[in-house]
Amino acid sequence: MDSGKVVITLKEKEEKVKDLRPIDDVFFEVLANDVNFCQEMLQILLEDKDLVVTDVVVQSSEKNLYGRSVRLDALCVLGNGKKCNVEVQRSDNDDHLRRVRFNAASIAVKDSQEGEKFEQIEDIIVVYISQFDIFKADRVLYHVDSTIRETGDRVDDGLYRVFVNTEVKDGTTVSEYMECFLKKEVNNLKFPAFTKRMNALKHEERGLDAVCEVMEKYEQKAVEEGLSLFEKAITMLASGKSPSEVVLTGVPQNIVDRASRAMKPKLNK
């Protein structure tokens, strides 16, 4: 029986995903759904060759209990019981420090038990990967700690924040690893798990299917969000708001323009 779903060939799948890079949300979500990849990544970025990853929960995973309102690109469970949330950000259009604080707090609240003492709250590591130098100090890697202003002493509150970027090139292993996030193909003997995972997702049918499935989810979500914004624009325009006022509420200009054109026949009647 024909399900109505279009079947595409291996070649067509390769063509569909060929331009995706690790820094792209849709691709990283699939890329990170692999313990070996995440373990190698964190060993390098956290500079700990003995680090062990025992489990990974990605945004689309059935194991994800945190909800869509909390964007967790890859939540890794480490061998020592700590959790490490890896986030990828291409656009410099938000308050990144507050985003990190919000997501870390959400993880802590979700995983805490009623009546649990605060000393029992699990430590959380956040690795924030960006396509830009967030602190503009020409470093590829930043560690952000809580400190006492008067003494300069570091305070251990259980939150460890590491910011790493693809913009700065300083010749280190971390910098070389981050350069791979901008490539469409990765073939580097220094990063075997990264190389193997990229090859599987770009050239093996099972991996290609996984990428295409997530791409379809992103495309469907974009359609739904666009429709919701279009309906919002129509409602606001019908209530007497000007197009510029609608744009100020966060509706993109192109959607407001479409809504305005759709309203014209009604206004002319």
Task: Indicate residue ranges for each PLM-predicted region.
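Accessory alpha/beta interaction modules
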Residues: M1-Y160, D170-T172
